[in-house]
Amino acid sequence: MATMREPRFKLSRRLGVNIYGHPKAMKRFETTNTRKKKISDYGMHLIEKQKLKAYYGVLEKQFSRYVKAAMKNKEASGSSLLKILECRLDNVVYRIGFANSIRQARQMVSHGLILVNGKKLDIPSYEVQVGDVVSLKEKHRQNEMFSNNFMNLSTFNVPYIEKNPDEFSGKLLRLPNIDEIPIKVNEVAVIEFYSK
């Protein structure tokens, strides 16, 4: 499992974005970051790359593979990269609302709690395809934390995923449009970082 060694709140404040969705993550940043340091173009590109890696919890080796795949795609490389990341199984589990963070979603997948089209899949990086149905194993649906998350989390109700409360599942209806992905990042700068 990908692990980030820097404390989560500290990393969020350093990158200037709440990558973990915790309400207290940016508290100190808002009160202390009144004067911004001038950042070079290289520094800006690096921050955008680190922001995207940290948000999706992907380490450098795998992230660079995603970038290479995106650069081979016919559509804009930045858009393609975001779509690849957004379709990771751990992220889809998070978007559906089974978990309150991508980190928690990754643990659920790794521990075999998640089904894709009715079959257990324990690979967080698995690329969910359009039409795939992702569900929670039936024996875990009574777990209070998972059921509360699924029924109550509306932070990431996204139009490209259809939730089915009766079946504890979500279906990837289509690939997302860039403006629908709930993270503010300069994806073009990320591609440019790897193009140099």
Curated annotation (Swiss-Prot):
Coiled coil regions, renumbered to chain: none
A GO-annotated cellular component: small ribosomal subunit
GO molecular function ontology, one term from the record: structural constituent of ribosome
InterPro entries noted in UniProt: Ribosomal_uS4, Ribosomal_uS4_bac-type, Ribosomal_uS4_CS, Ribosomal_uS4_N, S4_RNA-bd, S4_RNA-bd_sf
Its job: One of the primary rRNA binding proteins, it binds directly to 16S rRNA where it nucleates assembly of the body of the 30S subunit.
Family: Belongs to the universal ribosomal protein uS4 family.
HAMAP family in UniProt: Ribosomal_uS4_B (MF_01306_B)
Name of this chain's protein: Small ribosomal subunit protein uS4C
Record organism: Clostridium acetobutylicum (strain ATCC 824 / DSM 792 / JCM 1419 / IAM 19013 / LMG 5710 / NBRC 13948 / NRRL B-527 / VKM B-1787 / 2291 / W)
